[in-house]
Amino acid sequence: MRICIKRVYEAASPDDGERILVDRLWPRGLSKEKAAIDIWEKDVAPSAALRKWFGHDPDKFDDFRNKYRKELEDNPAIKRLEDMIHHLGKDKKVTLLFGAKDETHNQAAVLKEYLDSNDN
């Protein structure tokens, strides 16, 4: 299974495979048609409190990563996502979509690390 991340505002591509939005909130100004999302897994997104605390501040990213990973460990929605990805098959590509402008310091990057570390 190949897992990638991509800004939801970038154009959809057949190379994206299964497109999964991992934001709790729908991306501003983006129609459902243009987003071309297969699945919206908002329950695996960081809690509202953690998202607000982080505020996409790169200086807080290491702490954010640790706190978000802890949330994921305690979140039953992550198991559903892992199972879904597993059932897609090893040859399928999955693209985790996020709305943040920072392509490095965001929840999708942490979620990808988490899923990769669990061999999904």
Task: Name each model feature, range by range.
Residues M1-N120:
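Residues lining hydrophobic/aromatic ligand-binding pockets adjacent to catalytic sites
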